[in-house]
């Protein structure tokens, strides 16, 4: 970092003169301190001397005395002959405290230098104003990634803000482990840590990385990108090369997936996000590891079974999942829970033999052991996808249930897949794509979801929805939405909608967004017949949403009225539907004016008469619903919506106390749906649904009243 370009840097301090004063070597005015290198021999002597003398040391030594002792080292890093003389005495017992103080003086926060000083060994932090954040480009469990610009040079970098608790030493050590591992690795296919942004008083840090334009998840999800076999081999070769470098240095990544494999415009793939990485257990150190690592779709079976002793083979399973995803175009193992993920693995790759379960010491082995043995169908499944034998052989090796059969990254690089034609292409020959990351893929999915929701509508809505859908509407997945066919009739030059869904409700209508409001439609979902929130069986098709009203002088049969009632049959009372009308606001206002001119103002007596007729009609419907033999396809009540004119009439009637649900003798809920008592729908859920519909109706009424003014 800064001017410390060598990974072999050992010195922990800036150069110090004999007076104990820091001698700052400024690089291009950046204020970064040059750290001199010490040869390995001197480093070994210092460390051994520290370990032997540190415990015995009790006296303190001033900074100037220590400075003069360090001054015996020449600026070239070579120890002078006097270092070996007995007259030179290092009081290394307090050296660690001196180094902590030196790191704080260099700009590091005390909570970091006290707990994880080795992670920032020899580095100087960037200033907080050295970079300008532009936008977020990634989001992880423990971090957020931003695109940023270096203020001095204008260079684009990636800033990773790590989440941790600086008051908890273990949390700080967990964060610092990523820094230690990244400093240990140096490979073209491993992301490079360029520095750290923090200050003495800061409670957070930002890691500075080189900027990469793409990740594999974003490229795979792009509809315009289709990888060829040489391109896939190129990416896989780079991935395995980077992992081979990690494993050779005892590092497990433990979170290999498409979004952590970054690609730049030069076609170079780099393994990133070492937040869950750890060192492999040495033969003499069997410290238990956690099994709660690796994203679920890429997690190997031994971790799903609770293994606490594992090695680099966990990364190879994840590589196999990524490889199959590159070839097929989507993840091959998409479980929603750990149990389901394990079941999918056994069905595809086969379950382990009986000896594996007997010898296994995994905590969850007997708990998750399948009752029947699975032979696996991986080869047959991949052959159906048109993959070659070389492709299938490598995938089968990487996706072996038993870890020792997966081989290593180096053996995978010399497999038949890479040695047969067509060979891997050169990274420089890869096409330059538009920036594509996982977050871009999510945006595309959201846009597609909005389009699908918008296509469920045939008409355009001239007014914005007045409220968000209920909470239970947000829980319905998009794939559960079923679209019902709708028919339209042309009347008076306008499109009039007749629903053919027998039990469509107001909840359904509130779910359907307009085509020109796609920006607001991300939280609105379509509903269907099966989405009615009652737990009981709905065997009666009834009207819902708003009550019906119709002024009629002649008595008409209720059954024929139910069959024929539609907006076309009552043009004098029902205005254009707010949810399905294709008219604009201007057309709606013109229609209202025409109706007012044609019919004139309603008197209070007429309103009362109309509402009495309405209540009478609903009572007849209720009695009809009491008879089981009256249920039939011809008795479906078509849902209608109340116009502004009807609402005004109801408002006047409400003032006179003639609302049906306010009568003490006959209580009828006009917000529907009306269900037969004989079918015993849960009373609590029905009351909850009724309250929701009343609130929704009130919001629609209020909006209609405002627009009428």
Swiss-Prot record:
GO CC, alphabetical:
plasma membrane
List of residues binding ATP: 137-145, 160
Q: Which GO terms describe its molecular function?
A: ATP binding; protein serine/threonine kinase activity
Top-level taxon? Eukaryota
Indicate, by first and last residue, each region the UniProt record lists as having compositional bias (Polar residues): 495-505
Location of the region described as Disordered in the Swiss-Prot/TrEMBL record? 53-80, 434-536, 566-609
- Primary enzyme class: transferase
Q: Where is the composition biased (Basic residues)?
A: 484-494
Covalent lipid sites (N-myristoyl glycine): 2
Under InterPro entries, the record lists: CDK (IPR050108), Kinase-like_dom_sf (IPR011009), Prot_kinase_dom (IPR000719), Protein_kinase_ATP_BS (IPR017441), Ser/Thr_kinase_AS (IPR008271)
Q: Residues in domain Protein kinase?
A: 131-418
User: Which Pfam families does the record cross-reference, listed alphabetically?
Assistant: Pkinase
Q: Where is this chain compositionally biased, Basic and acidic residues type?
A: 437-449, 509-523, 586-609
Q: Please state what is observed when this gene is inactivated.
A: Impaired in beta-aminobutyric acid (BABA)-induced sterility. Altered BABA-induced resistance (BABA-IR) against bacteria (e.g. P.syringae) and oomycetes (e.g. H.parasitica) associated with reduction in priming for salicylate (SA)-dependent defense responses (e.g. trailing necrosis and pathogenesis-related PR-1 gene expression). Reduced primed to be primed phenotype in transgenerationally primed plants exposed to a second BABA-priming.
Assigned EC number:
2.7.11.-
A biological process term (GO) from this entry: positive regulation of defense response to bacterium
Question: What family, per the record?
Answer: Belongs to the protein kinase superfamily. Ser/Thr protein kinase family.
Q: What does this protein do?
A: Required for beta-aminobutyric acid (BABA)-induced resistance (BABA-IR) against bacteria (e.g. P.syringae) and oomycetes (e.g. H.parasitica) via priming for salicylate (SA)-dependent defense responses such as pathogenesis-related PR-1 gene expression and trailing necrosis. Involved in BABA-mediated sterility. Necessary for the inheritance of BABA-priming to next generation, especially for the primed to be primed phenotype which consists in an enhanced second BABA-priming in transgenerationally primed plants.
What is the protein name stated in its UniProt record? Protein IMPAIRED IN BABA-INDUCED STERILITY 1
Q: Which organism encodes this protein?
A: Arabidopsis thaliana (Mouse-ear cress)
